[in-house]
């Protein structure tokens, strides 16, 4: 038999011995652990109970012990008898059901019962007092208050207070005072604020001043100078980043039906007017977008010699502009 075979056999035998030794050690440790867990250490229980008894402060003080000069009582601690080992509770034999445990307070009835049945908690009763209402007290005179203050059941108001007398005098004066002021139908200023518009459209119309129609070539040139791009639904749109991929802020439509611009005949068509409109809510800030649409309308009106009208077809002046801005 060669050396390699001998070494292999020796290694296998050593490995088997290690495994057997490990299993035997593990079983021995486990058996020791369970033996210790099943034992009841009465010595530790007795020492722990004695320690708790020693920590108790003496409560009984003899009232008959005095200092001769100061007549001050001297507390005399009384030693309490410690229970003997025979009186200790055997916890292994005192396993009681939780249902039999009751919590009670000395000199009172047991309130809490840990049993299966649940008793309703006792609601504390509060004394009720018959106090006069505020309206009755306010309507009383000084004589009535003084007469009622003598009543045993009413002691909540001090009629001698100067502040109360002043208030009652003012109240009595207001009740007997006659209002001679005549009310006239005077116009009242409207203070109700209009609600902000959050949906729908805001529109501005642009029509020519003198001529009957706008020239198509000039109109297209003016729109492209302001960054409008002909796109969806054959209308001109003002995008956020001046690119088709960005959101639309507001748009321009043709007043003539169907409201579109012919992409193949832009240089030869004429129109009676255009409409600028913004849909709410708009991308970003509605107020900033509305101001931008107003500036575009003013620029187009200057370039095309046109007039701006409101949605009610009235002149778009400074007052109308403020009303538009107040809507958003």
From Swiss-Prot:
GO terms for cellular component: cell division site; plasma membrane. Disulfide bonds: none annotated. Residues 26-328 are cytoplasmic. It is a single-pass type I membrane protein. Residues 44-82 are annotated as: Disordered. GO terms for biological process: division septum assembly; FtsZ-dependent cytokinesis. Residues 1-4 are periplasmic. Pfam families: ZipA_C. Its main location: membrane. It is found in: Cell inner membrane. Signal peptide: none annotated. InterPro entries: Cell_div_ZipA (IPR011919), ZipA_FtsZ-bd_C (IPR007449), ZipA_FtsZ-bd_C_sf (IPR036765). Residues 57-67 have a biased composition (Polar residues). Keywords: Cell cycle, Cell division, Cell inner membrane, Cell membrane, Membrane, Transmembrane, Transmembrane helix. NCBIfam families: septum_zipA (TIGR02205). Essential cell division protein that stabilizes the FtsZ protofilaments by cross-linking them and that serves as a cytoplasmic membrane anchor for the Z ring. Also required for the recruitment to the septal ring of downstream cell division proteins. Belongs to the ZipA family. Interacts with FtsZ via their C-terminal domains. This is Cell division protein ZipA. It comes from Haemophilus influenzae (strain ATCC 51907 / DSM 11121 / KW20 / Rd).
């Amino acid at each position: 038999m060669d050396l390699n075979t001998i070494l292999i056999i020796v290694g296998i035998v050593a490995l088997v011995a290690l495994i057997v030794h490990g299993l035997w050690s593990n079983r021995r440790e486990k058996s020791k652990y369970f033996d210790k867990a099943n034992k009841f250490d009465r010595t530790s229980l007795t020492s722990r109970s004695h320690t708790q008894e020693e920590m108790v402060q003496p409560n009984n003080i003899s009232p008959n012990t005095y200092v001769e000069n100061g007549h001050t009582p001297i507390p005399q601690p009384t030693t309490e008898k410690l229970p003997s080992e025979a009186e200790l509770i055997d916890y292994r034999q005192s396993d009681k059901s939780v249902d039999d445990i009751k919590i009670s307070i000395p000199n009172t009835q047991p309130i809490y019962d840990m049993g299966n049945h649940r008793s309703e908690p006792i609601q504390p009763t509060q004394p009720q007092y018959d106090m006069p209402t505020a309206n009755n007290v306010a309507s009383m005179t000084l004589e009535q208050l003084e007469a009622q203050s003598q009543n045993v059941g009413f002691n909540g108001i001090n009629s001698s207070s100067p502040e109360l007398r002043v208030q009652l005098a003012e109240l009595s004066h207001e009740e007997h005072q006659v209002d001679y002021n005549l009310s006239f139908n005077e116009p009242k200023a409207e203070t109700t604020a209009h609600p902000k518009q959050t949906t729908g459209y805001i529109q501005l119309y642009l029509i020519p001043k003198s001529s009957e129609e706008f020239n198509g070539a000039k109109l297209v040139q003016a729109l492209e100078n302001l960054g409008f791009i002909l796109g969806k639904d054959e209308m001109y749109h003002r995008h956020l980043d001046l690119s088709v991929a960005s959101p639309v802020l507001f748009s321009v439509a043709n007043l003539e039906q169907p409201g579109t611009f012919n992409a193949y005949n832009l240089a030869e068509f004429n129109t009676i007017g255009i409409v600028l409109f913004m849909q709410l809510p708009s991308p970003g800030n509605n107020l900033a977008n509305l101001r931008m649409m107003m500036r575009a309308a003013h620029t187009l009106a200057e370039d095309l010699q046109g007039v701006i009208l409101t949605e009610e077809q009235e002149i778009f002046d400074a007052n109308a502009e403020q009303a538009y801005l107040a809507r958003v």
